[in-house]
């Protein structure tokens, strides 16, 4: 027996040769982390985006489109300027730069997730880890911000960044989106577009890009209402889970229904579980095999700075193992609270009660007769400031006065008797809350590559893509048996009819029909329609199945209906 063929290399060759995808800027030597989609690849990519868009729209989500370039202050508020970093190290001899955590992982075979720059530097020194390019000594580790920086306008005085995620464009529009949703939670907003990350050393082909496409939904909900109203529709769906405790104990993944996973405490609530099922169903609809999908819960040190809990939908790759393709994160109120604080905008939602409630509230104000001589012209301003404080801050003030007997406000030391404090009852009909956010975030490029990898079939006499039929970049090829009349004219008329019926179709008369079958099998075309010598006699053609190679005969007038059944309804 010969060596097992290298599936990765075969797929890379097929992708380049047949027009799916290849590295960008080839004629100038290329640039790592950038890929171009060819005619066939771009079609599949659009189909993936369409499947995700349709899934979001079925949930009643609204679509938004916002700029790729974003002013710096947005990312200061979101935490990306401070937190969106990777550890970097430089060779003192040749100047090459590398991800420090990757170098340490490869050299020592350990997990470096969550390690500080100081800890990584210590390991590099202790184990004498050298530059993989020239063997030179490495510098201390420092943090490198992954956002692409730019300048907005001709004067260069406004710094901006290419967005590292599409989400912030949604958060900064929350006031308008909430008004559009009529102030009613929950509601979802999604965006499909480009994101950019200046990866230090992008590797693994299409799996780590500097420019990539995301489809992110931000689902705004009341944190006091975490039961999804339609959970019963998905509660029996099975999910393959790899929770934190199983990772820490080196246990295998488990398979539970969505309902069991919530009851056992693996998934925090039915709201979260519902959207995990939605993500799984989208991946299945794209054509990822069910046994290649799992959900892995991120360890606390892995989570993004905004995340309270994250589960990654991972797809298995023969070459790369389990690959993160979708993140489902509970972002809490992190983003809206940060943008409220930095912008001063009110990003709350008024929640109306079913019935009015009587609540006890603190009223705190200054005793103006006592403090007037002390505060003089500042007395009125400070009094209004205190009266405008929230309930929590007022209670903190009272506790401090009880404990210390005095406080300092705006540089003035004030005693307990300087305040008028009383508890009152108030009837309220609702309350303002900062909504929490659940975010299903799809990458598009990784599922694209893994769909092709998991569709590639290598047989003795052919290599072909057994891609899900409605995901094929060319849905039907129309072939005259030989390039002679009247077969050519009949075949071309059928081709034009199928185009008008909405099929992605091609007409091909070059080479033997056997070679043409192989050509279209290779790129995943599910059906070839052949016009043969019987066609002029009885008005029938053959439909050849890519996977089985079997053929059936149908009448030309029935062809669009039959193909629609085979491709989109089977």
Curated annotation (Swiss-Prot):
Function of the protein: Catalyzes the attachment of glycine to tRNA(Gly).
Listed name of the protein: Glycine--tRNA ligase
Sites where the protein binds ATP: 197-199, 207-212, 324-325, 443-446
InterPro entries the record matches: aa-tRNA-synt_IIb, aa-tRNA-synth_II, aa-tRNA-synth_II/BPL/LPL, Anticodon-bd, Anticodon-bd_dom_sf, Gly-tRNA_synthase/POLG2, Gly_tRNA_ligase_arc, GlyRS-like_core
Chain's gene name: glyS
Record key words, sorted: Aminoacyl-tRNA synthetase, ATP-binding, Cytoplasm, Ligase, Nucleotide-binding, Protein biosynthesis
GO CC terms in record: cytoplasm
E.C. no: 6.1.1.14
PANTHER family the UniProt entry points to: GLYCINE--TRNA LIGASE (PTHR10745:SF0), GLYCYL-TRNA SYNTHETASE/DNA POLYMERASE SUBUNIT GAMMA-2 (PTHR10745)
Organism per entry: Thermococcus kodakarensis (strain ATCC BAA-918 / JCM 12380 / KOD1)
């Amino acid at each position: 027996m010969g060596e097992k063929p290298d599936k990765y290399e075969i797929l890379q060759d097929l992708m380049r040769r047949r027009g799916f995808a290849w590295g960008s800027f080839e004629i100038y030597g290329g640039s790592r982390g950038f890929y171009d989609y060819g005619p066939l690849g771009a079609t599949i990519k659009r189909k993936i985006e369409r499947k995700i868009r349709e899934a979001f729209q079925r949930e009643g989500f609204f679509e938004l489109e916002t700029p790729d370039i974003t002013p710096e202050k947005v990312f200061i508020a979101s935490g990306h300027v401070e937190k969106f970093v990777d550890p970097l190290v430089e060779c003192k001899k040749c100047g090459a730069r590398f991800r420090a955590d990757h170098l340490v992982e490869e050299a020592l075979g350990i997990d470096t997730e969550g390690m500080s720059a100081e800890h990584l530097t210590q390991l590099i020194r202790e184990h004498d880890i050298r530059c993989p390019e020239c063997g030179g000594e490495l510098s201390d580790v420092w943090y490198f911000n992954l956002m692409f920086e730019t300048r907005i306008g001709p004067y260069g005085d406004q710094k901006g960044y290419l967005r590292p995620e599409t989400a912030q464009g949604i958060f900064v529009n929350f006031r308008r989106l909430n008004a559009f949703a009529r102030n009613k939670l929950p509601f979802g907003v999604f965006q499909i577009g480009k994101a950019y990350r200046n990866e230090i050393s992008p590797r693994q082909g299409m799996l780590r890009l500097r420019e990539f496409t995301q489809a992110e939904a931000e689902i705004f909900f009341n944190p006091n209402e975490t039961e999804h109203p339609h959970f019963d529709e998905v509660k029996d769906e099975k999910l393959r889970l790899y929770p934190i405790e199983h990772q820490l104990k080196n246990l295998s993944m488990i398979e539970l229904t969505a309902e069991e996973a919530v009851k056992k405490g693996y998934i925090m609530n039915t709201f979260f579980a519902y959207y995990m099922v939605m993500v799984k169903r989208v991946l299945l609809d794209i054509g990822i095999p069910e046994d290649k999908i799992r959900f892995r819960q991120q360890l606390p040190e892995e989570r993004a700075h905004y995340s309270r809990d994250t589960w990654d939908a991972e797809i298995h790759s023969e070459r790369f193992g389990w690959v993160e393709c979708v993140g489902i994160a509970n972002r809490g109120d992190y983003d809206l609270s940060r943008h409220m604080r930095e912008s001063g905008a009110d990003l709350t939602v008024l929640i109306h009660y079913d019935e009015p409630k009587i609540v006890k509230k603190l009223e705190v104000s200054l005793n103006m007769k006592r403090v007037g001589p002390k505060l003089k012209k500042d007395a009125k301003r400070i009094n209004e400031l205190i009266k405008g404080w929230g309930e929590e801050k007022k209670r903190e003030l009272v506790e401090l006065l009880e404990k210390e007997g005095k406080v300092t406000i705006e540089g003035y030391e004030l005693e307990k008797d300087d305040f008028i404090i009383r508890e009152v009852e108030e009837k309220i009909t609702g309350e303002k809350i900062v909504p929490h956010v659940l975010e299903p975030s799809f990458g598009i490029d990784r599922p694209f590559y893994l769909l092709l990898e998991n569709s590639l079939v290598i047989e003795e006499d052919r290599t072909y893509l057994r891609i899900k039929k409605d995901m094929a970049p060319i849905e039907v090829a129309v072939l005259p048996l030989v390039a002679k009349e009247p077969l050519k004219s009949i075949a071309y008329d059928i081709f034009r009819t199928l185009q008008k019926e909405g099929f992605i179709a091609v007409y091909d008369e070059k080479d033997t029909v056997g070679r043409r079958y192989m050509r279209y099998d290779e790129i995943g075309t599910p059906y070839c329609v052949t016009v043969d010598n019987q066609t002029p006699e009885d008005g029938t053609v053959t439909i050849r199945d890519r996977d089985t190679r079997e053929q059936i005969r149908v009448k030309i007038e029935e062809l669009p209906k039959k193909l629609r059944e085979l491709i989109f309804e089977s």
